[in-house]
Design a protein with these regions (language model features):
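Detector for Asparagine
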Residues: 6, 36, 72-75, 95, ...
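Alpha/beta-hydrolase fold catalytic core
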Residues: 1-63, 86-88, 125
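Active-site loop/oxyanion-hole signature of alpha/beta-hydrolase fold enzymes
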Residues: 92-131
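Active-site loop->helix "elbow" adjoining a glycine-rich segment at hydrolase catalytic centers
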Residues: 134-136
Length: 136
């Protein structure tokens, strides 16, 4: 497992908030947000700042939607993600080195899986459902 930074919230140049506390993240109600209205947030894991969005009803297992190789968190159709969010929490993310996430894009599927597991850990989530397509 990788460690995440425990920084205090701060506003970044883009106007999005760096979210530091996984305990708070796993108990926050994201039901007010939709795919396009949810703020893009960031969590740092081993020097990589991962961009993600969380929205939907915080009931049951959250679903983490993994991206294809160079896809970003806006590649999923909002009509689909918003429909999923009516019954559960949805988490969209950019892979390392893609979109708003920093670092280098992993060269292997194993590397992508490690990054996804590290992000899930950093968000304080014990159990999730995963959904992906292509290399996601």
């Amino acid at each position: 497992m990788r460690s995440h930074s425990n920084q205090s919230p701060e506003m970044l140049e883009t106007g999005t908030e760096l979210m530091p506390d996984p305990a708070e993240l796993s108990t926050t109600d994201y039901s007010e947000h939709t795919h396009n209205a949810a703020p893009t947030r960031f969590v740092e894991v081993d020097g990589i700042r991962f961009a993600y969005r969380r929205f939907g009803k915080p009931m049951g297992e959250p679903i983490v939607l993994l991206q294809h190789f160079m896809g970003n968190l806006d590649n999923y159709d909002p009509a689909i993600t918003d429909a999923l969010a009516m019954g559960r929490e949805v988490i969209l993310t950019d892979n390392a080195g893609v979109g708003l996430s920093t670092g280098e894009a992993p060269e292997t599927v194993v590397g992508m899986a490690r990054d996804a597991a590290s992000l899930i850990d950093a968000l304080g989530l014990e159990y999730v459902d995963l959904f992906g397509f292509s290399m996601g």
